[in-house]
Amino acid sequence: MTEFSKTPLLDTIRTPDDLRKLRIDQVQQVADELRLETIDAVSVTGGHFGAGLGVVELTTAIHYVFDTPRDRLIWDVGHQAYPHKILTGRRDRIRTLRTGGGLSGFTKRTESDHDPFGAGHSSTSISAGLGMAVASDLAGTKNNVIAVIGDGSISAGMAYEAMNNAGAMNSRLIVILNDNNMSIAPPVGAMSAYLSRLYSGKTYRSLREAGKQIGKHLPKLIADRAARAEEYSRGFMMGGGTLFEELGFYYVGPIDGHNLDHLLPILQNVRDADAGPFLIHVVTQKGKGYAPAEAAADKYHAVVKFDIATGTQAKTKSNAPSYQNVFGASLVKEAQKDDKIVGITAAMPSGTGIDIFEKAFPKRTFDVGIAEQHAVTFAAGLATEGFKPFCAIYSTFLQRGYDQIVHDVAIQNLPVRFAIDRAGLVGADGATHAGSFDNAYLGCLPNFVIMAASDEAELVHMVATQVAINDAPSAVRYPRGEGRGVEMPEVGIPLEIGKGRVVRQGNKIALLSFGTRLAECEKAADELATLGLSTTVADARFMKPLDVELVLKLAREHEVLITVEEGSIGGFGSHVMQTLAEHGMLDGEVRMRSLVLPDEFMDHDTPAVMYARAGLDAKGIVKKVFEALGKDKAETVKLA
């Protein structure tokens, strides 16, 4: 029996050039098939799901109307770009998404000419797009630049900085606001679509431009009032465009982002316009076309592998709690005893465990949106008034608020508590989301207390420690995922500041861990013991202030000292070496080595594979020990 393809038109498309050869009445079928393919692919690989389904029609329309990749198409964040990847020559690899050697879960310049700008973090698209548009002007190429940005991303300050700059120029920048939360505009319909098409057309724009020219010859008061009347009438009729008009954009919308009869003519009008910048306001629904995702957008924002028929996700059960949940629960316990504790997150309440705190203390919880800079200084302001703010942010996103950390927190020595989630490698999300650098970029700042939890029980105590620190900013870092399954304390007990602990005593090799690589150090010690190498394993707990007494003792009493951390060069190991150098301990007395992440941006894979490649698993630690000893490992032991 012949098996018929569920995607016959999509099967004919290798590049957007093939799409543009189709009749306009075939575009809807392409979109329908593209949605089916996206659902099927993500059910196999997992990944970001709802956002991609929400832009299927928009993606199809953009590639049909514009001459991509000559016309540049930038996806803000990039997590909604799976349909885009399918249409741009990557369908044959779409079921390798977020796997080792496979396609990235975000846009990536090295992956395709159709990805002119890489992404992962939010709110960068308009700035990058404006740069490309100005470059086109300078080069005389006059190609279009389209930046697609969500209503969450456009709330960030960088987006408004870019729009403010773009509004003062006449470059061919087209911003498409993908509004999937209805946070800006009222419901859309036929009248709105008709008006959008009318206002984006050449006739209306020509009349409007003529009106502007006439206004230049009128008394300023009359001209200003006329312009204001036109602006507000459009804002009233169209629902929400006045802000963008004030920034210098020509606003069109809102329009139904799932109706190609609305999208195609408006995109064509904007494409054929003589100047810019434009902002097209498109309203979409996350998870569109897949009932479980439509019904529970939050649960289907990002998914693991799932059954298409039922929507059931194949989540593995763990006997250990996740670090984010341990943090959230620990903060609740502390806040029950201290009404000065408040929780802050930047649009990541469930990802950081702040949602647990919010359920217990809704009035003491603040989700500031995608605004890390504001989150940090907002926390600083709370600290000046005697409150105890816990600012829970992923390591990779905390980078966005670095000047505020330095200028508003550290210099003023304000006791803001940073809970740094997703520290270290994060796996499938790759380089843009890796928490590789916080050891280095926080460790160089005066006044900070910096901790890393070696397991979930330690995290409980470190949260309690942060509560007790009232005279300095502090940070605790911990990874994504589940803990080790250790016995959990009933309550957190504040740790002695700047003091580590020895978890296993030896006399030949010393392994000093900062963070959750402690478990791999213990495995390495077991293997080294079988080879007759007595090994001490220590948990540093603190990078700053460093336990100098412990570091010097390990260096004096062992032949080899190796530091191990889930961070880049310039972090914990550098602090240890600096200390040893200042005490003359690197003058031939100890063989010191530092295990850190490679000095590169590592591509996505599973965390286990990535750490093994970095030499930060037990096997890599043992190998480093033998390199330090200077012995030929092939003669001493088979490490494979």
UniProtKB/Swiss-Prot annotation:
Binds 1 Mg(2+) ion per subunit. The keyword Metal-binding applies. Mg(2+) binds at D151, N180. Keywords: Isoprene biosynthesis, Magnesium, Metal-binding, Thiamine biosynthesis, Thiamine pyrophosphate, Transferase. It comes from the Bacteria. SUPFAM superfamilies: Thiamin diphosphate-binding fold (THDP-binding) (SSF52518), TK C-terminal domain-like (SSF52922). CDD domains: TPP_DXS (cd02007), TPP_PYR_DXS_TK_like (cd07033). Thiamine diphosphate binds at H79, G120, H121, S122, G152, S153, N180, Y290, E372. One of its GO terms (molecular function) is thiamine pyrophosphate binding. Pathway: Metabolic intermediate biosynthesis; 1-deoxy-D-xylulose 5-phosphate biosynthesis; 1-deoxy-D-xylulose 5-phosphate from D-glyceraldehyde 3-phosphate and pyruvate: step 1/1. Its EC number is 2.2.1.7. One of its GO terms (biological process) is glyceraldehyde-3-phosphate metabolic process. It catalyses: D-glyceraldehyde 3-phosphate + pyruvate + H(+) = 1-deoxy-D-xylulose 5-phosphate + CO2. Its cofactor is Mg(2+); thiamine diphosphate. InterPro entries: Dxylulose-5-P_synthase, THDP-binding, Transketo_C/PFOR_II, Transketolase-like_Pyr-bd, Transketolase_BS, Transketolase_C, Transketolase_CS. The keyword Metal-binding applies. Belongs to the transketolase family. DXPS subfamily. Catalyzes the acyloin condensation reaction between C atoms 2 and 3 of pyruvate and glyceraldehyde 3-phosphate to yield 1-deoxy-D-xylulose-5-phosphate (DXP). HAMAP family: DXP_synth. PANTHER family: 1-D-DEOXYXYLULOSE 5-PHOSPHATE SYNTHASE-RELATED, 1-DEOXY-D-XYLULOSE-5-PHOSPHATE SYNTHASE, CHLOROPLASTIC. Homodimer. This is 1-deoxy-D-xylulose-5-phosphate synthase.
